Amino acid sequence: MTAKRAIGRHESLADKVHRHRGLLLVISIPIVLIALVLLLMPGTSTSVSVIEYTMKNHEGGSNSRGPKNYAVIFDAGSSGSRVHVYCFDQNLDLVPLENELELFLQLKPGLSAYPNDPRQSANSLVTLLDKAEASVPRELRPKTPVRVGATAGLRALGHQASENILQAVRELLKGRSRLKTEANAVTVLDGTQEGSYQWVTINYLLRTLGKPYSDTVGVVDLGGGSVQMAYAIPEEDAATAPKPVEGEDSYVREMYLKGRKYFLYVHSYLHYGLLAARAEILKVSEDSNNPCIATGYAGTYKYGGKAFKAAASPSGASLDECRRVAINALKVNNSLCTHMKCTFGGVWNGGGGGGQKKMFVASFFFDRAAEAGFVDPNQPVAEVRPLDFEKAANKACNMRMEEGKSKFPRVEEDNLPYLCLDLVYQYTLLVDGFGLKPSQTITLVKKVKYGDYAVEAAWPLGSAIEAVSSP
C-alpha cells in the first residue's frame, strides 16, 4: 500500500491524464455542448424571431401589425337605418372585427318616418350609435370618422324638412359621441356619391380596382327612394358625354383608385327606388283601383309623408296591366331621348361597353328575389335572369291576399299587398329601363366574398374607404 502511494507521488502529469482519460472524457462532453449552445445562441435567437414574425404575418397578414383605422358609417335609407363599422390596416385591407369583417346593425323605420319631429328622428339612431362606438377601441374613438349618409328617402321630404332632421342628427353626435365628426359628416348624399360609393365597394371587394376598366363590374343598386347605375367607361366616351339637364349631377365622375384613373358613368334616378316607385305607380291610377295590388286588398300606402290609395281591381291583379302602368310610371318614351342611347326619362345610358358586360345588382333586387323564393337567402350571391322576376311576378299577381303567406312565407305581412307590383316593377326596370335582355345573366348580390368573409355589398364601405383616406 505504501509502495503504491509512493508511485502515485512520483507520477508525471501525462501519466495522470492517461490514467484518468475516461473520467476527463465524461466531464468534457457536457462542457463542450454548453460552449456550443452559448456560441450559437445569438443565431438561434434571430431565427426564432424571424419564425415568430413569419408565423404572425402568415396568420394575420399585414393586418396583424401596424396601425389600424376605424370608420363608422350610417346608411340612413328610406326603409330603415343601418350602421357599418369597418377596420382597415395600413394597406387599406379590411381587418376582422371579432368574428366578422364588419359590424353591421340595422333597425326600422328610417329617419324619414318622422318628417315633423326631427328630434325623434335623430334619437332613433341612439341604439345603433352606442353599439357602433362601443366596438371601436376607446383610444381610437377621437380619430375615428363617423358619417351619416341620408339617401333618397330623406331627399323626398324636401329641403327644409330634411335639413331639420340632419341638424338634429348633428346635435346628437356632438352631444353623445366621442367619434370624429367632419365638416360634412352628416349630409344627404347626392346621386353620384351614392352610386360611385357602391361601385367602389363592390369592385374593392372583388379586387378589380387597379385593373383595366373593362375588367371591372357594373352595378345597379335599387334602394327605397332611388336607383343608381354605375359602371366604368372608356375615356373617349367620357369626353363626349352629354351635359346633364339643369339641376342634375354630371354623368361622369373621374376617380383615381389603386393607381389607375377611371371614368365612371353614374346616375341616380330619384323617385325610382322600390318604395318610391310604389307611390309613382299608385299615382298613375290616382284614386281608382290599381291592377298591381293583390286581389282582395284595400288599404293606404304611405310614403314621404303622403298617403296613396292602394286597392285591388275588382277583377284582381294583372301582370300585363301592371306592366303597362309600370312602363308609364318609368316614363319609357324614346321621344324624350335627345342622345344616341337613353335609359328612361330621357337620361343618357353611358354608352354601354366593357364596363357594363358584367352586372352586379344589389339591395332590393336581392331581397325580393329571396322572398319570392327563386334565390337562396342564405347565399351571398346568385345568378339569375330578368325573366326570373317576371315568372315570380306572374305567380304573385295571380295570388289572392288571403293565400299570400302560404304561397310566399318569406314575405313580410306589410309587403304582401305590393309583391306583384314590386316584382313587375323590377322586371320592367331591368328590361325596359336599363335595356337588359330578358334572358341576360345578372348577378344578384347581398354580400361579396373577401378572403374567408362575406361583406355586405353596400355603398357605406366605399364611403369608409374615402373617409380613412382623407387627411
From Swiss-Prot:
Query: Which GO BP annotation is one of this protein's?
Result: pollen germination
* Lumenal topological intervals: 43-471
Which InterPro entries does the annotation name?
GDA1_CD39_NTPase
Instruction: Name the source's superkingdom.
Output: Eukaryota
Pfam families reported for this sequence = GDA1_CD39
GO cellular component, alphabetical, reads:
endosome; Golgi apparatus; Golgi medial cisterna; Golgi membrane; trans-Golgi network
Where it sits in the cell: the answer is: Golgi apparatus membrane; Membrane
Q: Which residues lie on this side of the membrane: Cytoplasmic?
A: 1-21
The record's note on what follows loss of this gene reads: No visible phenotype under normal growth conditions. Apy1 and apy2 double mutant displays developmental defects including the lack of functional root and shoot meristems, and morphogenetic and patterning abnormalities of the cotyledons. Double mutant exhibits a complete inhibition of pollen germination.
Protein name from the UniProt record: Apyrase 1
- The organism is Arabidopsis thaliana
Q: Which gene encodes it?
A: APY1
